[in-house]
């Protein structure tokens, strides 16, 4: 650039604003151009441009291709019998929720004591501070 041009640069002049605007538009176009090419796949793709793509092995999900496990018929019969005896031995609906809680060690049906005092009053009375007697200045 010419030194005289730098000295006479005035941002208020229309021709100078136009030059700045055109330069900014040119920068924006050059920044958008690589994005339009579709080469923004990844950061390391430029390193592998000349090399052939690696071949991937086809993986099959085992759960879809695996056949169900074959159980011998005598083992299936024993399993069915044990399930039926377990179901028949269990009493149906004989235990109440209170009995099951008591068997676990809890007390589900025990009444809960509810205090009529507010928590703030209880704390004030425990401290012996103002508000415990209800009269200020005693």
From Swiss-Prot:
Pfam family, one: Cir_N
Functional note: Involved in pre-mRNA splicing.
Record localization: Nucleus
Residue stretches of biased makeup (Gly residues): 128-138
InterPro entries: CIR_N_dom
Sequence ranges of Basic residues compositional bias: 56-70
UniProt protein name: Pre-mRNA-splicing factor CWC25
A single GO BP: mRNA processing
Region (Disordered): 28-138
Species whose genome carries this gene: Eremothecium gossypii (strain ATCC 10895 / CBS 109.51 / FGSC 9923 / NRRL Y-1056) (Yeast)
Domain of life from the UniProt record: Eukaryota
Similarity remark: Belongs to the CWC25 family.
């Amino acid at each position: 650039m010419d030194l005289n041009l730098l000295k006479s640069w005035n941002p208020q002049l229309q021709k100078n604003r136009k030059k700045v605007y055109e330069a900014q538009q040119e920068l924006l176009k050059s920044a958008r151009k690589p994005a339009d090419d579709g080469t923004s796949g990844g950061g390391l793709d430029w390193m592998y441009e000349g090399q052939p793509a690696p071949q991937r092995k086809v993986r099959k999900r085992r759960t879809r291709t695996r056949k169900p496990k074959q159980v011998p018929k005598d083992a299936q019969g024993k399993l069915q019998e044990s399930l039926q005896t377990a179901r028949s031995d269990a009493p149906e609906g004989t235990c109440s929720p209170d009995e099951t809680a008591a068997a676990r060690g809890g007390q589900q049906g025990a009444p809960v004591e509810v205090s009529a005092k507010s928590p703030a009053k209880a704390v004030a009375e425990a401290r012996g501070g103002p508000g415990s007697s209800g009269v200020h200045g005693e």
